[in-house]
Amino acid sequence: MIQVKVFDQEHEKDLEYDMNRFLERLDENKLVDIKYNVAAMPEDDEEEQIYCFSAMVIYRA
């Protein structure tokens, strides 16, 4: 069976940490693919942007 695990963080290092923890427990032969995305949105009434780093790990269960 194919399954997915979705990760979503505001900081790329947090996403990296979470994914590495998950991948440590996953047998390499079960990994199918990893999809990665970054979204940036302006913060209300400020010049800063809010970032959303996300990834989806596709694997065999």
Where are these regions (language model features)?
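Short amphipathic
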Residues: 1-10
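Residue-level signal for short amphipathic helical patches enriched in basic/charged
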Residues: 10, 26-29
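A short acidic, often aromatic-flanked loop/helix-cap motif at beta-alpha or helix-coil junctions
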Residues: 12-15, 39-41
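A short, charged, amphipathic alpha-helix used as a generic interaction element across diverse proteins
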Residues: 15-23, 27
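Short, mixed-charge low-complexity intrinsically disordered segments
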Residues: 28-36, 40
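Short proline/glycine-enriched turn/loop segments at secondary-structure junctions
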Residues: 42-48
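C-terminal edge-of-domain segments
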Residues: 49-61
